[in-house]
Design a protein with these regions (language model features):
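A sequence-composition feature that detects small, non-aromatic residues
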Residues: 4-5, 46, 54, 70, ...
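Amphipathic alpha-helical interaction modules
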Residues: 16-65
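Short terminal alpha-helical segments
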Residues: 1-33, 87-92
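Short intrinsically disordered terminal tails
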Residues: 1, 36, 96-100
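Amphipathic alpha-helical binding modules
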Residues: 63-100
Length: 100
């Protein structure tokens, strides 16, 4: 898999955090904690598939943000801000891949 394709797929996975959080906030059992853990496992594993990610500050920031969200409660506005911030970062990273 090409790095740009992975980052695009990951951006979609990060976006999915929004409806899952909203469904959970509305009382549905969506297993958000399991989804976040699976997402983190994938992101950490990707650092072996794409070694350049391991030293990329933007990528590490996204991983750290997901880890924070896994352990701490957030307001709706904070959750949305974090998700859209991560999506923006991943989108910029994809742009860098195309420019190379």
């Amino acid at each position: 898999m090409e790095l740009a394709a992975y980052l695009e797929q990951l951006e979609g996975g990060v976006f999915k955090l929004l409806p899952l959080w909203e469904d959970q906030d509305n009382g549905q059992d969506v297993h958000l904690d399991l989804y976040i853990q699976d997402l983190l496992d994938e992101m950490i594993g990707a650092q072996e598939t794409f070694p350049s990610l391991a030293g990329n500050g933007h990528y590490i920031k996204v991983v750290n943000t997901v880890q924070y969200m896994a352990k701490h409660e957030c307001s709706r506005s904070a959750w949305k801000r974090r998700v859209f911030g991560m999506m923006s970062t991943l989108n910029r990273m994809r742009g860098y891949c195309r420019d190379v």
